[in-house]
UniProtKB/Swiss-Prot annotation:
The lineage of its organism: Eukaryota, Metazoa, Chordata, Craniata, Vertebrata. Phosphorylated at Ser-29 by DYRK2; this increases the ubiquitin ligase activity and promotes degradation of EGLN3. Phosphorylated at Thr-24 and Ser-29 by MAPK14, which mediates the degradation by the proteasome of EGLN3. Homodimer. Interacts with UBE2E2. Interacts with VAV1, without mediating its ubiquitin-mediated degradation. Interacts with CACYBP/SIP. Probable component of some large E3 complex possibly composed of UBE2D1, SIAH2, CACYBP/SIP, SKP1, APC and TBL1X. Interacts with UBE2I. Interacts with PEG10, which may inhibit its activity. Interacts with EGLN2 and SNCAIP. Interacts with DYRK2. Interacts with PEG3. Interacts with NR1D1 and NR1D2. Interacts with DCC. Interacts with AXIN1. This is E3 ubiquitin-protein ligase SIAH2. It comes from Mus musculus (Mouse). GO terms for molecular function: ubiquitin conjugating enzyme binding; ubiquitin protein ligase activity; ubiquitin-protein transferase activity; zinc ion binding. Residues 34-43 have a biased composition (Low complexity). E3 ubiquitin-protein ligase that mediates ubiquitination and subsequent proteasomal degradation of target proteins. E3 ubiquitin ligases accept ubiquitin from an E2 ubiquitin-conjugating enzyme in the form of a thioester and then directly transfers the ubiquitin to targeted substrates. Mediates E3 ubiquitin ligase activity either through direct binding to substrates or by functioning as the essential RING domain subunit of larger E3 complexes. Mediates ubiquitination and proteasomal degradation of DYRK2 in response to hypoxia. Promotes monoubiquitination of SNCA.
Amino acid sequence: MSRPSSTGPSANKPCSKQPPPPQTPHAPSPAAPPAAATISAAGPGSSAVPAAAAVISGPGAGGGADPVSPQHHELTSLFECPVCFDYVLPPILQCQAGHLVCNQCRQKLSCCPTCRGALTPSIRNLAMEKVASAVLFPCKYATTGCSLTLHHTEKPEHEDICEYRPYSCPCPGASCKWQGSLEAVMSHLMHAHKSITTLQGEDIVFLATDINLPGAVDWVMMQSCFGHHFMLVLEKQEKYEGHQQFFAIVLLIGTRKQAENFAYRLELNGNRRRLTWEATPRSIHDGVAAAIMNSDCLVFDTAIAHLFADNGNLGINVTISTCCQ
């Protein structure tokens, strides 16, 4: 699937279109060729998208894990927001009757949710702030498995990267707002993004077609091996004005810890030239935005792409391997 975009990868880019009948992919090397898939991009007004893949036009510190005593739970419950049931953390504001509500919910309310009294003027509860500084709070994802308790200053940073937070749809550039558990990610992709093809095996060919399309374009497909699923992403974007670049990376449909057990190699090969990148796959919890921003992936410009392309089609050899721990 494809839909070139002039607004770059941050634009809304649909990630699931029913593909027309498959086209014949570019043939890989004749000597014991690995599995191959064609990933096509189609220009405006075109509907030709091979069934092999999706093309989309167009990131804790401290604490502990000791058992929480009933007394500690009773103390932290005093900080529960009556609206969202998260914890009220400093700066702590109260209504005129002394009831607490977290700062996020307070901005949406016109009166106290407990007594219906006025929330203004803002009254600071310094005593509760001192107590909060002496208490370790559970992670907001404790109900899904996180056992850490943290100082209130460490809690927001940890929760931004907590392994137990919900997984978002990993489809890059898509407008899909789905969130769910890790176990539900593949089911979501298979049902909501059916145009993303999965190839079996640790050594495959990722063939992106129509790489000369203008604007920002993403090519996506899946690779299944070693009992896991990997997402292969090739993005073309204008990182600098007038200078388009390609970024290729592999993500694991799994946690960061699981990703450390694998390595991947991306290789452009042809015309007696070779360009190789080897790295550890990123977890889909991390996404691709940070890797692209830091060029922590296979990066090449359009001039290099044309050295390896054949009639506007670019084949990338992808090899997944396990790491000895």
